[in-house]
């Protein structure tokens, strides 16, 4: 039996807001809510909702003959709950059909597998729990962030209970081998490995609407013909895509939804191929050999390695600084700090710091909120500096940090008390002041004439009496003399 495996990745990071140096220590909220919500609504309306609706219609039409596979990051599910719960509901409807498989990955869509095994396990377990909670299914297959994989990572996830992984069929690891077969892990042969056919996958993901492409336009009929050629000497065609291919990276006007609508019909009508999930393929096929991947691979960029996230000094510095906090994070019980820890681990933050150019640079610009890799680095490190201050308070690193944390707690409590007392003082001032002012006004109106006039005029009256008395005596003497002179004149 020859199969086609359609797998779609769904992920949106919590994008960070512009965080300045002067915000450090003062602002502990790091996310651009407006940008995150607007992008989620945009992608939901252009991709997730119409694509899910179409897939549900196809499953109803073709039943178990049409099957697809998804991986949805934990951070994406968080944002669905916040901004677009209808998207989560549409995925639930797909899960209920029994024709859709959901894969496990790290909750944060992170690169933690390269730093700490315990944290890696916790994130995978948390993601698995979320899938069970929201979609009522239990993942049996693992996919690394951006299909990152190595022999060592494969062996680790096998021990976690995942006997099947999916990854990239990179040229430098395949050599003469074909990605159209099932393989096994080089360290643990019990683990089965499905490899992405990157040529057929990229025809849809990147070249579908490219009018300068020699094969443009790509029809469902032509594409099925290419799959038939690939499976002449193969057993499975693994078509792994970013789900935003439908409606976002390739617009509705490009005809991508019409392509998806007619694709199952062309396959089922003109070939004997079966659509299958990774679990079904691993159950029905046997590995042809081991695939050796001593160094990590991914599906990103031309190199198919980790350079998209860890390819320059900026990325390495930020990455190492973040994971140097792991041991203390594991001792932390502050819920807000732990939530930020999950969101700050998203691989996208390091992806935005990439200095790659040309064709890969165009891909790196998708939903990138920063003007340059250096802006992304500075912004992230400012946030990380504030995060470390908070972590030092919650989980001191040494005796000095312990003392500082204690003092910081005391200062915090004192500031709270001061704010309380200042509020009480202000309240007291506002109350009595109004009453006093009213009484004073009333008193002034009724008592001003008698009290203030008498008090101020009394000295003046005393002074006036002293000066008037001599004048009165002189006037009397003058009058007496005139009277005597008049009498004397009459006598004569």
Language model segments and positions:
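Active-site and substrate-binding clefts of carbohydrate-active enzymes
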Residues: 1-46, 60, 181-183, 187-191, ...
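Short, well-structured secondary-structure segments
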Residues: 3-8, 14-116, 140-143, 163-168, ...
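An acidic- and aromatic-residue-enriched active-site/binding cleft used to recognize and process polar
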Residues: 8-13, 73-75, 107-110, 144-154, ...
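Generic structural signal for well-ordered alpha-helices
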Residues: 52-56, 88-92, 121-131, 154, ...
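Acidic, His- and aromatic-enriched active-site or binding-groove loops in soluble protein domains
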Residues: 87-104, 121, 125, 137, ...
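Short, charged, surface-exposed secondary-structure boundary motifs
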Residues: 113-115, 173-181, 203-205, 285
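CE4/NodB-like, metal-dependent polysaccharide N-deacetylase domain
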Residues: 119-146, 226-240
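Intrinsically disordered, polybasic Lys/Arg-rich low-complexity tracts
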Residues: 430-492
